[in-house]
Amino acid sequence: MEFRNNFQELKSQIEYLSSLNKEDVTHIIKSSIYELESLKVFNEEELNEINKVTLISEPFNNLFFKYNKERLITKGVVYIEEENDLQFIISLFYFFKQRVPILFHTNSKLQLQSVDILFKFLEENGVSKKILMGINV
């Protein structure tokens, strides 16, 4: 029974994320990146990598995927556990941009701080924080 309830909750989060406006998602990511920049823990090259997330095209811009998308599974859940802070943050923003529910496990203070910043801007923009769920391993 618990699995069924979890599945229904997951399904509702996927539908909710799909309904989010692309501009709102981009705004939340950019606001979070700006806040991360103010922490002054990343060098210029790392910040450029993080900023690329907002420039990445929608998933079906590639011609193969564009014409085969009705046969591909495009909804699911992502689990992020990464030692490298930069990769964790890029993955977090990327999968949020793709509107995929995220389960995560933080491995550092900076990763936790990044999640808190994203939560802050989700809340400020009226977006449910249920789309991100921390998991203690």
Regions found by a protein language model. Name each.
Residues 1-76, 94-100, 107-108, 112:
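N-terminal Rossmann-like NAD(P)+-binding subdomain of aldehyde/semialdehyde dehydrogenases
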Residues 76-89:
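Conserved AMP-binding/adenylate-forming
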Residues 88-136:
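PLP-dependent aminotransferase-like
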